[in-house]
């Protein structure tokens, strides 16, 4: 029995996207960071959070607690819309998604090297080109028992999202091919 048939019979077993995290590693504070914030806000529709350097690196001119990156967490419909655009940008730059990108509980990450690959984006010399890492986290219905405050419990292994389920979901929902080595 395929995953699609199981999901139709038992909707609680169908995985869903919990969140999509978009990371911009600019590497320096200042103008590039503020321009990057405008770019990521235009792509996602949300204002980003600045990430701080964890340690000092004099070779790159980075001090501890200096803002050097940006991140945005998307949930619900916004996450699915952004992920659809991200997959089209990913295909545009000639990349493929490998099964080795998925972990054992179905989460995966991929990178888009240029923000201008997204639909509707044009190159502007004053902005430059920014790349980003996109991390997708999956869950199933009932995962709230793991994170709630009262009567917290663990998720049984049979209810965790598997790597194969996540691959099947991505292929069906976003019409994206996942290459198995």
From Swiss-Prot:
Keywords assigned by UniProt? Answer: Ribonucleoprotein, Ribosomal protein, RNA-binding, rRNA-binding, tRNA-binding
Q: What InterPro entries does the record point to?
A: Ribosomal_uL5 (IPR002132), Ribosomal_uL5_arc (IPR022804), Ribosomal_uL5_C (IPR031309), Ribosomal_uL5_CS (IPR020929), Ribosomal_uL5_dom_sf (IPR022803), Ribosomal_uL5_N (IPR031310)
> What Gene Ontology molecular-function terms does this entry list?
rRNA binding; structural constituent of ribosome; tRNA binding
Q: Which GO terms describe its biological process?
A: translation
GO cellular component term, pick one:
ribonucleoprotein complex
What HAMAP family does the record point to?
Ribosomal_uL5_A (MF_01333_A)
The UniProt similarity line reads: Belongs to the universal ribosomal protein uL5 family.
What PANTHER family does its record include?
60S RIBOSOMAL PROTEIN L11-RELATED (PTHR11994)
Quaternary structure (record):
Part of the 50S ribosomal subunit; contacts the 5S rRNA and probably tRNA. Forms a bridge to the 30S subunit in the 70S ribosome.
Q: What's this protein's function? A: This is one of the proteins that bind and probably mediate the attachment of the 5S RNA into the large ribosomal subunit, where it forms part of the central protuberance. In the 70S ribosome it contacts protein S13 of the 30S subunit (bridge B1b), connecting the 2 subunits; this bridge is implicated in subunit movement. May contact the P site tRNA; the 5S rRNA and some of its associated proteins might help stabilize positioning of ribosome-bound tRNAs.
Enumerate the NCBIfam families for this protein: PRK04219.1
Output this protein's name: Large ribosomal subunit protein uL5
Lineage, opening ranks: Archaea, Methanobacteriati, Methanobacteriota, Methanomada group, Methanococci
Q: Which gene encodes it?
A: rpl5
